[in-house]
Amino acid sequence: VRFSLRPLFARCALAVALPVAAALALAAGTGSVHAQQMPPGAKQPSDFPHTKLTAGMYVINAAVAANDADREQGLMYRTHLAPNEGMLFVFGENAVHCFWMKNTLIPLSIAFMRADGTITDIDEMQAETTDNHCPRNNGVYALEMSQNWFTQKGITPGMQIGGLPQPQ
């Protein structure tokens, strides 16, 4: 009787390779689903104008959404934000501006501000929901940051955000 380890090794390799290949295929498929959701003509993060803002001792690198198309896209389809990175929404009118999280893949915090940069409201928003997030007060700016950013940095209503561009 001849005994060989070759069939045993082949079965073990197959038992390991199949689950690994399935996991990789699933991960690749998940990533491509999000990539496919970005509509043609949507701006990449680097395509937005950027500005530096201050919140207390923190410097924020903010993409600026100052027109209807940019405000509509906002942070949709983004899979992460760098530390101290966010998006500033600039409105031409002093009003209640509501937000939702449709096609927004990461949870965010939002601060609503008056024309002088004073924060009136801060809210936490869950990814991919259509719940309305509206401030209690009129304003001309909103700043979206990673979830809990304002809380973690000790930024509260009544404080001011500096470096804001003038509303148009």
List PLM regions with ranges.
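N-terminal secretory signal peptides that target proteins for export/translocation
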Residues: V1-F9
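Compact, glycine-rich, soluble single-domain proteins
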Residues: Q36-Q168
